[in-house]
Curated annotation (Swiss-Prot):
It comes from Acinetobacter baumannii (strain ATCC 17978 / DSM 105126 / CIP 53.77 / LMG 1025 / NCDC KC755 / 5377). It catalyses: CMP + ATP = CDP + ADP; dCMP + ATP = dCDP + ADP. This is Cytidylate kinase. Belongs to the cytidylate kinase family. Type 1 subfamily. PANTHER family: CYTIDYLATE KINASE, CYTIDYLATE KINASE/PANTOATE-BETA-ALANINE LIGASE. It is found in: Cytoplasm. HAMAP family: Cytidyl_kinase_type1.
Amino acid sequence: MTVQIITIDGPSGSGKGTLAAKLAAYYQFHLLDSGALYRLLGLSLHKHDLLEKLDSHLDECVNYARQLNIKFETSAEGTLVFLDGEDVTQTIRTERVGEYASKVAAIPELRQALFERQRAFAQTPGLVADGRDMATSIFPEANAKIYLTASAESRAERRVKQLQGMGLDAKINDILANIQARDKRDMEREVAPLKPAADAYIIDSSELTIDQVFKLMVDYVNSRTVSN
């Protein structure tokens, strides 16, 4: 049976994760949060004092990427994420770990090490894959390719609300600066830079609600022959 694949790419804070989860639930597909993999690897390398030694200890870092001990569990509260048996669901969503992930994602050898792990998520009946290069690199054969974007300012505002909702301190100027820096790093990296696939459906969510974007996505996906 052919596995149907929906990709959602876009910059940090555009709403990819929330909408990918909604689509996966709607179509009863598997879900890949590729950003979580990079965050988990970044966190693991930081814990092992390797994040600042990527160049000098690259082989060791690649081995960590290949042997990353991770587990995803679905619960009533959402998806729980474990690293080496420890629940790191909240930890990996912090700005600091997001910066770790961006550093890791800029290293071609580490991206390659995570390539097959991501491909393995494509199982019947289908997959919703959320990331930066899902359509351009990991799943170019996807049935439906969505590129979700929004202005840096609107993404910063959303991120502040998200962090405050988690009980974390967040300053809009710091968040905006981090988003702009990550955008630049993601778009200018040599391997798999952040950009929409040539045949992607582009949605700017700056002035749209989650429900409005979700409807646009479902209409598009259904037009690409993926049925509910």
